[in-house]
C-alpha cells in the first residue's frame, strides 16, 4: 500500500509540474511567439495543439480524450498488477500515467494541448512536459519488458 501511495504522489507532482509549466507559458509568451531559451538548442513558444503528436488529426478532441482515458486506465491496471515488479517497469508506467493525464487535463479544460518546447538543432515537433513523460515512460517500459523477456520472466 505504501508503494502505491508514493506512486500516486509522484504522479500528482509530475502532473502539477506539467500544468505549472503550461500555465507559465500561456501567461508569459504570446501565442505563436518564439523565444530562445538555451541558444541553438531549445526555444520556447506557445502553441495550441488541437491534434495528436506532430499535430496530426486536428480537432479530434473527443477521440483523443477517449483514447487517453483508455491508455491511462490500462496503465493504471497494469501498474496495479505489476507494482512489485522491477523499479523500471513501475517508473515507466508512472511516467505514462502522468503524461497522459497532463495532456488529458488540457484537452478537457481547453480543447487543446499547450505545447512549448522547440528543438532548434533538428526539425522536430513542438512538445510539452507531459509529452516528455510519455516518451521517456514508453522507452523505459519497452526496455524493462525487453529485459524481462531476455531474462525469461
Curated annotation (Swiss-Prot):
Coiled coil start-end: none
Biological-process GO terms, alphabetical: proteolysis
Pathway field: Protein modification; lipoprotein biosynthesis (signal peptide cleavage)
EC number from the UniProt entry: 3.4.23.36
Keywords annotated in UniProt: Aspartyl protease, Cell membrane, Hydrolase, Membrane, Protease, Transmembrane, Transmembrane helix
GO molecular function, one term: aspartic-type endopeptidase activity
Membrane topology: Multi-pass membrane protein
Catalytic activity: Release of signal peptides from bacterial membrane prolipoproteins. Hydrolyzes -Xaa-Yaa-Zaa-|-(S,diacylglyceryl)Cys-, in which Xaa is hydrophobic (preferably Leu), and Yaa (Ala or Ser) and Zaa (Gly or Ala) have small, neutral side chains
Protein location: Cell membrane
Record-linked PROSITE patterns: SPASE_II
UniProt enzyme class: hydrolase
Subcellular location, principal: membrane
Annotated active site: 115, 131
Top-level taxon of origin: Bacteria
One Gene Ontology CC term in the entry: plasma membrane
Family as reported in the entry's similarity comment: Belongs to the peptidase A8 family.
Pfam families for this protein: Peptidase_A8
Gene: lspA
TM segment ranges: 6-26, 60-80, 85-105, 124-144
InterPro entries: Peptidase_A8 (IPR001872)
Lineage of producing organism: Bacteria, Bacillati, Bacillota, Bacilli, Lactobacillales
Function noted in UniProt: This protein specifically catalyzes the removal of signal peptides from prolipoproteins.
Name of the protein: Lipoprotein signal peptidase
Amino acid at each position: 500500500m505504501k508503494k502505491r501511495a508514493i506512486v500516486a504522489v509522484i504522479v500528482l507532482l509530475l502532473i502539477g509540474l506539467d500544468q505549472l509549466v503550461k500555465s507559465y507559458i500561456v501567461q508569459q509568451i504570446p501565442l505563436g511567439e518564439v523565444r530562445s531559451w538555451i541558444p541553438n538548442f531549445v526555444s520556447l513558444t506557445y502553441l495550441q495543439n488541437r491534434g495528436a503528436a506532430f499535430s496530426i488529426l486536428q480537432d479530434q478532441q473527443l477521440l483523443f480524450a477517449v483514447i487517453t482515458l483508455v491508455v491511462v486506465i490500462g496503465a493504471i491496471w497494469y501498474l496495479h498488477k505489476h507494482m512489485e515488479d522491477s523499479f523500471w517497469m513501475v517508473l515507466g508506467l508512472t511516467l505514462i500515467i502522468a503524461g497522459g493525464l497532463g495532456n488529458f487535463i488540457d484537452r478537457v479544460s481547453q480543447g487543446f494541448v499547450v505545447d512549448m518546447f522547440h528543438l532548434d538543432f533538428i526539425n522536430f515537433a513542438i512538445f510539452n512536459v507531459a509529452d516528455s513523460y510519455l516518451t521517456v515512460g514508453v522507452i523505459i517500459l519497452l526496455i524493462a519488458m525487453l529485459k524481462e523477456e531476455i531474462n525469461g520472466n
